[in-house]
Amino acid sequence: GLIKPGTLWCGMGNNAETYDQLGPFADVDSCK
C-alpha cells in the first residue's frame, strides 16, 4: 500500500494491526 513517510496507518492498506500501534502520530496515521 501507499504509506505516508513516518506513519504506519495512513494510505491504501496499512502496516499496523491495531490502533495501539499508531503511536504519537495517531491523528496522521489514522488519516483524520
From Swiss-Prot:
Picking any one GO molecular function of the record gives: phospholipase A2 activity
What catalytic activity is recorded?
a 1,2-diacyl-sn-glycero-3-phosphocholine + H2O = a 1-acyl-sn-glycero-3-phosphocholine + a fatty acid + H(+)
Q: How is the cofactor bound?
A: Binds 1 Ca(2+) ion per subunit.
* Domain of life from the UniProt record: Eukaryota
GO terms for CC?
extracellular region; nematocyst
- Name the EC number(s): 3.1.1.4
Co-factor(s): Ca(2+)
Q: Does the keyword Hydrolase apply?
A: yes
- GO process annotations (BP): arachidonate secretion; lipid catabolic process; phospholipid metabolic process
What is the uppermost EC class here? hydrolase
Q: Which InterPro entries match?
A: PLipase_A2_dom (IPR016090), PLipase_A2_dom_sf (IPR036444)
- One Pfam family this sequence matches: Phospholip_A2_2
Q: Where in the cell is it found?
A: Secreted; Nematocyst
Keyword terms? Hydrolase, Lipid degradation, Lipid metabolism, Nematocyst, Secreted, Toxin
Q: What does this protein do?
A: PLA2 catalyzes the calcium-dependent hydrolysis of the 2-acyl groups in 3-sn-phosphoglycerides.
What PANTHER family does the annotation carry? Answer: RH14732P
Instruction: Tell me its family.
Output: Belongs to the phospholipase A2 family. Group III subfamily.
Could you identify this protein by its name?
Toxic phospholipase A2
Species name? Rhopilema nomadica (Mediteranean medusa)
